[in-house]
């Protein structure tokens, strides 16, 4: 018998390390490039992105950019125009991520803290909820632990910190019950710096009705189709890991609709014997005692709103979600 723990992380750990992996960092890089030889479609896209930053509802996260690209498809008359703009954005993003991936990490990084955080994510919960998780974990008190990280980031930062090669396993700290805990190779569901994937969850997010059903368009900008064409089984592995997870930890993720496939899977998993710890971050959130339940409800409802669960199922699932707000999780310097 084994216990399966899954971590789904995006970019907060990289931001904590001072790495410029946010959309706004790429935005400045992309619009700062020489545009004199750009095609008409690329120039129009850059102008759109520039104007977007002046809007109150401007893109803040990578998922906002992805949804925005789906909306922007109404500006294309044919597949060729779409590919011109999309491929330039994707190629420049690849260039940018390669630059970030080559940067030296801070010498002060505490790799042992990363190992502890991966081993005991429940340490950041309040005592009552920590006890509830402990009692839940007792079911696997004699089991070996398997830990998987699904990274939505393109860089190899985690591998560098942990000093592991691409296909290496490593031993984390023993479980709270003294059994082994193995971290398996990190899975990059959106690809890595040599072939980053950026796009949509499904065809309904393509707002150009004339291009929506076009097979080439779908294969260009729908992430599940891109993973399917790559035939690397990464998507199959992530699907299987979520379906068998006993504990899922979400850290640093904007819960964007362009990854709705995975939120739906987690919603389905919550119908079973599984728990989720959602590490939310909002420095503007005041942790007044009288507001704690409101805050928990807000983040639980946000996560559940991304699933396809019925209202009755959401009510049941809510009791299986734990919110950890503004913690020191993965603060390594």
PLM features: residue spans?
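Short active-site loop/helix that positions an aromatic residue
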Residues: 156-165
């Amino acid at each position: 018998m084994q216990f399966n723990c899954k971590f789904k992380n995006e970019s907060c750990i990289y931001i904590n390390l001072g790495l410029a992996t946010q959309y706004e960092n790429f935005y400045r890089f992309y619009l700062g490039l020489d545009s004199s030889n750009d095609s008409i479609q690329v120039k129009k896209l850059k102008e759109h992105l520039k104007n977007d930053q002046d809007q109150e509802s401007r893109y803040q996260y990578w998922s906002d950019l992805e949804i925005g690209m789906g909306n922007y498809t109404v500006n294309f008359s044919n597949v060729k125009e779409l590919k011109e703009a999309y491929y330039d954005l994707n190629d420049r993003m690849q260039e940018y991520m390669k630059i970030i991936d080559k940067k030296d990490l801070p010498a002060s990084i505490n790799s042992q803290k990363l190992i502890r955080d991966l081993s005991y994510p429940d340490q950041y919960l309040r005592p009552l909820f920590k006890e509830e998780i402990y009692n839940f974990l007792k079911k696997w008190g004699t089991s070996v632990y398997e830990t998987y990280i699904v990274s939505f980031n393109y860089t190899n930062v985690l591998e560098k910190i942990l000093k592991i090669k691409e296909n290496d396993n490593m031993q984390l700290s023993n479980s709270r019950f003294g059994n082994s805990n193995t971290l398996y190779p990190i899975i990059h569901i959106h690809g890595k710096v040599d072939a980053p994937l950026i796009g949509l969850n499904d065809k309904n997010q393509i707002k150009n009705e004339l291009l929506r059903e076009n097979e080439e368009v779908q294969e260009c900008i729908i992430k599940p189709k891109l993973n399917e064409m790559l035939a690397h089984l990464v998507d199959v592995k992530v699907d299987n890991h979520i379906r068998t997870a006993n504990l899922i930890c979400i850290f640093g993720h904007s819960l964007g609709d362009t990854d709705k496939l995975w939120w739906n899977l987690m919603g389905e998993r919550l119908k079973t014997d599984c728990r989720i710890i959602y590490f939310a971050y909002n420095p503007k959130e005041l942790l007044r005692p009288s507001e704690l339940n409101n805050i928990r409800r807000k983040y639980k409802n946000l996560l559940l709103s991304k699933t396809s669960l019925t209202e009755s199922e959401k009510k049941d699932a809510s009791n299986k979600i734990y919110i950890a707000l503004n913690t020191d999780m993965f603060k390594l310097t």
